From Swiss-Prot:
Modified residues (N6-(pyridoxal phosphate)lysine): K237
Protein name: Molybdenum cofactor sulfurase
Molecular function (Gene Ontology), one example: pyridoxal phosphate binding
Alphabetized PANTHER family for the sequence: MITOCHONDRIAL AMIDOXIME REDUCING COMPONENT 1, MOLYBDOPTERIN COFACTOR SULFURASE MOSC
Family membership noted in the UniProt record: Belongs to the class-V pyridoxal-phosphate-dependent aminotransferase family. MOCOS subfamily.
Region (Disordered), start-end ranges: 651-678
Organism from which the protein derives: Emericella nidulans (strain FGSC A4 / ATCC 38163 / CBS 112.46 / NRRL 194 / M139) (Aspergillus nidulans)
Length: 839
């Protein structure tokens, strides 16, 4: 495989038109989006889809295994496109064959399964930067495996192959380009291993994972001696569509598949089922013996339109390589230049010291990085990805399906990773920082249609949210003329959310409401669960859930549910009995043999699902998601709030009282069981959530002050004041005198009492509420914007967490043992806080 070192990077040089013109016509979905995840998949052009549509509507394609005219047309097109694909990679069809597979992983598995079927098994070696799918091959290697952690180890191993005389079968696999950080490893290894193999008895084959590489660079297999035995790739990485992969096989290495046992339709010439089982494999070509069943012939035909469109727009992969290298270098330089007010760097980039964006043989257009604040503390990857998402910037975070490369870059050992797993860390979760170090990486990857605007937008995003400015002082000083014991607060409003993540039911003024140990009566007792996965739905993924509005009719003992925007008269209504065993036809099917396992905020629970088709149809039709209503079971299986987490949050106040972490203290020994754990139903973290009206007002002042005139009409609309409803609090408190507002004073509360006299109830403050992008969903329209999360990220970030509101828990013994009622509260009740600094 040949790579050009000397080609100078240039912005869209050689393209058919300026890239911005191409974007406007071919990629209209990029109008309001900055897409920086081309290593995951690049984007398909409008004209590709239109061309494919014309092809399908203008031709009749049958199953290529039949002999009809339509079937033979399909077979002919598949053969032609197979040849076109080989030529796209400069692979001589006399020397190579191409097998269509679902994706690169399917190609890897095809090779691994064939080697596993050999009588003695095989040995496997892989490079540390390998994709997870390459790592997984080691589980099939009977003769053992080895992970090579640097180039010197590989070179040393290759040099020793010539002296080995024992006969053995092996496979060495590595990526042409790391999908984590774009590092490119030496292409000479394939040629060197083949040369050593000719001088020894061992049979070491080479497998090149080119999936990441081919998305922006030309794969050149014209030098046969240097080409891998097997090359895997995915076409959607290059064209965006179709979802199809390929395994390119050197014909001289095809004997590897002779021990393959499984056969599918289309891969055999004859099969006997009577008497002794026997079959004859097709021998005419490698691809005929490996492509089991009917090929995805429509997807293969779409590949023809993909080649045509890509060539027309970008002319060549060399042009794409030059364009993306130019942008990557510019982005790297600008990220390196970002500094906080105190001179410390913002971005930690993970690059090999031998890599350079000026050298196509050493580096591709991918940037892997993490961020630090001005105090040198790491910023969690999940927070960055969430904030980027609400600003319509698409990036990737995590271990990026590259466990070895990520661990090596972050300095994690295998023992470290096992400790993290024992502590609860899983792929895709938000355990961002452990042992005061990041557990994952942020990734930006560029593609053929990326532009300078994408670079400028991302840099502006970092400058706005992650480049610290000189501090202007800390909010919430307690003034000396305010009596801490004067009950100057009251309950402005009370709300319950009968169905988790759906609309609020505002408790009417003058109505006293029961408080139970698990929170306000009827709060988050129901939820919607996906009928396929069993996972509870939430507004982060389905913002229209805000328009599902429950009403509690206690007189008739009904939960009345309407769907649609506020004040809409078109919404449908569903009534559910509040009794667990009802007489209504919709509720008689509840609970009886209807237990359903589900996942709520990471907890495994068993819910009681409504089995009536009318119930599931009501919610499914509105959301467009197959779901049904479910109810949390009786208190015998109540979930509990994590006091360990609350204790950490509790110390994260503006006085910065938290103790420094003790080196080597992770993981901590399990804490003793809490004799009085705080019960919760389907709420995320605590029985009740409290916010302050004055804090909402201050936040809205910050939102408005940050607003600037903008040519984008949508941006101006997103900067309007937000309603308190977006925080989905149970209790909103306000000062008795509006002129005496003290924003964020609740951050200093240790506990509070609501009411007076015999009706007074006490609540402990468990900690601050960590916010996510769900607060950006307008609870009246179901539309998602970028506020208030964008402003909270600037004004309320405390030690990596964006905080607003307080988790509270009622204290006391139930007055009513049957329903666990501790007492009642109502709108207008006095609120008397106690403070952290009180003795």
């Amino acid at each position: 495989m040949n790579l050009s070192k000397g080609t100078a990077a240039a912005y869209c040089s050689g393209y058919s038109e300026d890239v911005d013109v191409i974007r406007e016509r071919e990629y209209p979905l990029l109008k309001d989006t900055t897409y920086l995840d081309h290593a995951g998949t690049t984007l398909y052009a409008n004209s590709l889809i239109h061309s494919f549509g014309r092809d399908l509507t203008g031709n009749l394609y049958g199953n290529p295994h039949s002999m009809s005219a339509s079937s033979q047309l399909s077979a002919q097109r598949v053969d032609d496109i197979r040849l076109r694909a080989l030529r796209f990679f400069n692979a001589d069809p006399d020397e190579f064959d191409l097998v269509f597979v679902a994706n690169a992983t399917a190609g890897i598995k095809l090779v691994a399964d064939a080697l596993q079927n050999s009588p003695q098994g095989f040995w496997y070696g892989y490079y540390v930067d390998a994709h997870t799918s390459l790592v997984g091959v080691r589980e099939l290697a009977k003769m053992g495996s080895r992970c090579f952690v640097n180039e010197d180890e590989v070179d040393s191993w290759i040099s020793g192959l010539g002296s080995r005389r024992e006969e053995s079968l092996g496979l060495f696999a590595y990526p042409a380009q790391s999908n984590m950080n774009g590092r490119r490893v030496p292409m000479r290894w394939c040629e060197q291993i083949r040369a050593q193999k000719e001088n020894a008895d061992n049979m070491i084959y080479t497998l090149l994972d080119a999936a990441s590489f081919v998305s922006t660079s030309p794969l050149d297999l014209s030098k046969i001696a240097a080409a891998p035995d097997f090359t895997v790739l995915s076409f959607y990485k290059i064209f965006g569509f179709p979802d199809l992969g390929a395994l390119i096989v050197r014909k001289s290495s095809g004997d590897v598949f002779k021990h393959r046992k499984f056969f599918g339709g289309g891969t055999v010439d004859m099969v006997l089922t009577d008497g002794n089982p026997w079959h004859a494999k097709k021998q005419s070509s490698i691809h005929q013996s490996l492509e089991d069943g009917t090929l995805p012939f429509h997807s293969i035909i779409a590949l023809d339109s993909a080649f045509e469109t890509h060539g027309r727009l970008f002319r060549s992969m060399e042009n794409v390589a030059s364009h993306t290298r130019f942008l990557a270098k510019r982005l790297r330089d600008r990220m390196n230049a970002l500094k906080h007010y105190n001179g410390t760097k913002v971005c930690q980039l993970y690059m090999s010291p031998n890599s350079s964006y000026d050298d196509a043989s050493s580096q591709g257009p991918i940037l892997a990085f993490n961020l630090r604040n001005s105090r040198g503390m790491w910023i969690g990857k999940s927070e960055v990805e969430r904030l980027a998402s609400i600003k319509n910037i698409q990036i990737r975070s995590g271990t990026l399906c590259n466990p070895g490369g990520t661990a090596l870059s972050l300095g994690w050992t295998g023992a470290d990773m096992l400790r993290h797993f024992s502590a609860g860390m899983r792929c895709g979760d938000d355990h961002d920082i452990m042992d005061e170090r990041p557990t994952g990486i942020l990734r930006i990857s560029l593609g053929a249609m990326s532009s300078l605007t994408d670079v400028d937008t991302f840099i502006a995003f970092l400058e706005e949210f992650y480049v610290d400015k000189p501090p202007e002082g800390l909010p919430v000083p307690l003034t000396g003329n305010v009596s801490l014991h004067q009950p100057s607060f009251y309950v402005e409003s009370l709300s319950v959310y009968p169905i988790k993540s759906c609309g609020a039911f505002r408790i009417p003024d003058g109505q006293r409401w029961e408080v139970r140990r698990e929170g306000l009566a009827w709060d988050r007792e129901w939820c919607l669960v996906h009928q396929g996965t069993g996972i509870t739905l939430n507004q982060k993924r389905y913002p229209r859930m805000a328009l599902i509005r429950p009403t509690l009719d206690l007189e008739r003992c009904l939960l009345r549910i309407t769907c649609g925007e506020a004040n809409s008269r078109d919404g449908k209504t569903l009534e559910i009995s509040l009794n667990r065993i009802g007489t209504n036809s919709l509720t008689t099917s509840l609970c009886q043999n209807a237990s359903k396992p589900s996942t709520v905020c990471g907890d495994k629970v068993v819910l009681q699902a409504y089995t009536s088709p009318a119930v599931s149809r009501f919610f499914t039709d509105f959301l467009g998601v197959p779901c049904t209503l479910a109810r949390f079971p009786p208190q015998s299986s109540t979930r509990f709030h994590s006091r360990a987490t609350a204790a950490i949050n509790r110390d994260q106040n503006y006085s910065q009282k938290q103790s420094p972490s003790m080196p080597g203290s992770f993981p901590q020994a399990p804490s003793s069981p809490d004799p009085y754990p705080t019960p919760i139903l389907l709420s995320n973290e605590s029985p009740l959530l409290l916010i302050s009206r004055s804090s909402v007002n201050r936040l809205n002042e910050s939102i408005k002050s940050a607003s600037q005139p903008c040519s984008n009409p949508g941006s101006a609309a997103s900067k309007k004041a937000v309603a308190a409803d977006v925080f989905r609090a149970n209790v909103v408190v306000a000062e008795n005198i509006s002129t005496a507002e003290r924003p964020y004073i609740e951050d200093t509360w240790a506990s509070l009492s609501i009411g007076s006299g015999p009706e007074q109830l006490r609540f402990d403050v468990l900690g601050s509420c960590e916010r996510c992008q769900m607060v950006c969903v307008d609870q009246y329209t179901g539309q998602r914007g970028d506020e208030p999360y964008a402003t909270l990220a600037k004004t309320r970030k405390i030690d990596r967490k964006i905080l607003f509101g307080r988790h509270i828990s009622p204290v006391g013994r139930p007055k009513d043992a049957e329903n666990g009622c501790l007492g009642t509260i109502m709108v207008g009740d006095a609120v008397t806080p106690s403070y952290d600094n009180e003795s």
